[in-house]
A protein has these predicted regions:
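Hydrophobic alpha-helical membrane-association signature
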Residues: 36-40, 86-89, 192, 233
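Short, charged, surface-exposed hinge/linker loops at domain edges
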Residues: 215-224
Length: 264
């Protein structure tokens, strides 16, 4: 069923079981603006608060675009104050998505350009259809990727290919994106959403309390020394023993039954 947790028609949400499907629906190219960005942030915050939601699948409406990035009309005036407001809206939306406690999967059903690729970079896993094209073409229009592009793309593919895409404006196809480690899977046209949803369903086999802790640890590895990460890992392990899910998971296995998670 659809939930009215989105404050904007440009971001649509449907929840089925433990999976939320979030659709960028801003014709014609699913661009980002000052309405859709705060809406995405609000949606992720609402999903974070819903303990029955374990996974989020993000896709674009229609068959051509996942998202073509920022609506450039808002930058035509050259107003730095507008740039600051929009930049902060991008940052808040995509960082909230990156920190979603469950698993986020981008179902890239078409062009993912600029902020459209950056929102996919903020997800945990990316599945692209074979016809999808990915690019960060901001410099071509006198701008730069300010919603994580220079940071997250570099972490995923290394400096060389980040520079080819950002500084040389190279657009890459889905197969090459998989070779580079930018997407985890390539599927036939029209199948990204179904494939992402099937993967999201697998998330529910794991304890949602474990998943949230593991995601925090994996993300923290980007910023801290491994010696600190190894300590944090043990601390998070012990912290799980204050959750109902730890008791349920361990005992369900020993009793040879399926666990019933509580997400607490």
């Amino acid at each position: 069923y659809s939930m009215s947790i989105s404050p904007s028609e440009k971001i649509k949400v449907a929840i089925d079981g433990n999976i939320a499907t979030v659709t960028i629906d801003n014709p014609a190219a699913n661009t980002w603006d000052r309405e859709s960005l705060p809406a995405l942030k609000a949606v992720v915050e609402a999903l974070n608060a819903d303990l029955s939601v374990y996974a989020l699948v993000l896709t674009g409406a229609g068959e051509k675009f996942f998202s073509a990035g920022a609506d450039l009309n808002q930058f035509a005036s050259g107003d730095a104050d507008v740039a600051r407001v929009v930049g902060e809206a991008f940052g808040e939306a995509f960082e909230t998505l990156a920190d979603f406690r469950g698993v986020s999967i981008a179902a890239i059903n078409g062009f993912a350009m600029g902020g459209g690729l950056e929102v996919a970079l903020a997800c945990d896993i990316r599945i692209a259809e074979e016809q999808a094209a990915l690019a960060l073409p901001e410099a071509r229009v006198g701008l730069l990727p300010c919603a994580g592009g220079t940071q997250r793309l570099t972490q995923l593919v290394g400096e060389g290919w980040a520079k080819r895409m950002i500084l040389c404006g190279e657009r890459i196809g889905a197969q090459q994106a998989q070779t580079l480690g930018l997407v985890e899977e390539v599927v036939p046209a029209g199948e990204a959403l179904a494939t992402a949803t099937a993967l999201a369903a697998k998330v529910g086999n794991q304890s949602p309390s474990s998943v949230a802790a593991c995601k925090r640890l994996i993300h923290s590895a980007r910023n801290i020394a491994i010696s600190d990460g190894l300590v944090a890992e043990r601390d998070e392990f012990v912290a799980l023993f204050s959750t109902e899910d730890q008791q349920e998971g361990t005992n369900a296995f020993l009793e040879k039954r399926e666990p019933e998670w509580k997400n607490r």
